[in-house]
Amino acid sequence: MTLEQKGLKKQSITVAYFFDTIGKEHDIKLRRLNSVDEQKRRIFERDLHRPGLALAGFTNLFTYKRVQILGNTEMRFLNQHEEDARKNAFGNFVRFKIPCIILTSTNKLQPELLAMATEAGIPVFSTRHSSTKTMYLITEFLDNQFSLYQQYHGSMVDVYGVGVLLKGRSGLGKSEVALDLVERGHGLVADDVVVIHRKGESMILTAKRNKNIEHFMEIRGLGVVDVKANFGIRAIRDAKEVQVVVELLEWNKEMEYERLGLDTKTTKILGVEVPLVQLPIFPGKNITVIIEVVALNFLLKHYYDYVPAEALTKRIRTAIDQ
């Protein structure tokens, strides 16, 4: 796969998956208040909705496909009505195919209203968190779920805190280089299949491992290596920002390669420009050490705006001018 390919995105997730997963990834605990088939309800959008106007009867442009948040304001509005008016307002609300309802700040739904939601097949949950915190955590979760992503053939390594994505055709030794970097104290994020996410309009790309492959590597001539078992917990990372792409190339004497490093190359991943370093491979070349230097050069430029090639060029020009 080329790095320039178009990203993918989930179209929806089930409410059952939402309920089972969000508590594992964020500091929020949802309590189930009714029993309905949560597999039949799907969430299509990352945005949430507080349905004050819908409860008041104004349902034009009601974004019912979003997760509905009922906080202190919405519950106070319902509770101030007599039972018939309250049921009428809530009935007008649950006639839409809502994914689910979440009550915040430990608010409670009257039994008759909960029964109406159950009859409509709408899951109802509650949380002790405030509406503000609940919406922040759920939006963060849904942002991750609906982010652009793509799978790439390569290896992802944390080198001196810099996220380095190794790419190149099969058989060039990407896995061997990644393994050598791990042995030298760096951390493996993923090998063979690298899953890269871009959340919203952010310019940050996050690389993760394929959950089926985990931290296993295939080394030609050796077989499968379990990096976590062999090198311990220090040798693995769950995720890392993609900051530099290193492309391994077959040596071709007819081709001209970068010698000074003055020309900065980039490659585009999910619409984000990432620095690209192309390294030709030939016998005796220590690729591992070179990749460590690539990471150190990135840190020098990032923190001090220092580029060795530019510094050398400036020094030579100064000497000539003298």
UniProtKB/Swiss-Prot annotation:
Binding residue positions for ATP: 168-175
Xref: CDD domains: HprK_C
Gene from which this protein is expressed: hprK
Positions annotated to bind Mg(2+): 175, 218
Protein known as: HPr kinase/phosphorylase
GO biological process: regulation of carbohydrate metabolic process
Cofactor requirements of the protein: Mg(2+)
Known catalytic reactions: [HPr protein]-L-serine + ATP = [HPr protein]-O-phospho-L-serine + ADP + H(+); [HPr protein]-O-phospho-L-serine + phosphate + H(+) = [HPr protein]-L-serine + diphosphate
Annotated region (Important for the catalytic mechanism of dephosphorylation), positions in chain: 280-285
Annotated domain remarks: The Walker A ATP-binding motif also binds Pi and PPi.
Subunit record text: Homohexamer.
Enzyme Commission designation: 2.7.11.-, 2.7.4.-
InterPro entries in the record: HPr(Ser)_kin/Pase, Hpr_kin/Pase_C, Hpr_kin/Pase_Hpr_N, P-loop_NTPase, Ser_kin/Pase_Hpr-like_N_sf
Functional summary from the UniProt entry: Catalyzes the ATP- as well as the pyrophosphate-dependent phosphorylation of a specific serine residue in HPr, a phosphocarrier protein of the phosphoenolpyruvate-dependent sugar phosphotransferase system (PTS). HprK/P also catalyzes the pyrophosphate-producing, inorganic phosphate-dependent dephosphorylation (phosphorolysis) of seryl-phosphorylated HPr (P-Ser-HPr).
Active-site residue numbers: 153, 174, 192, 259
HAMAP family to which the protein is assigned, alphabetical: HPr_kinase
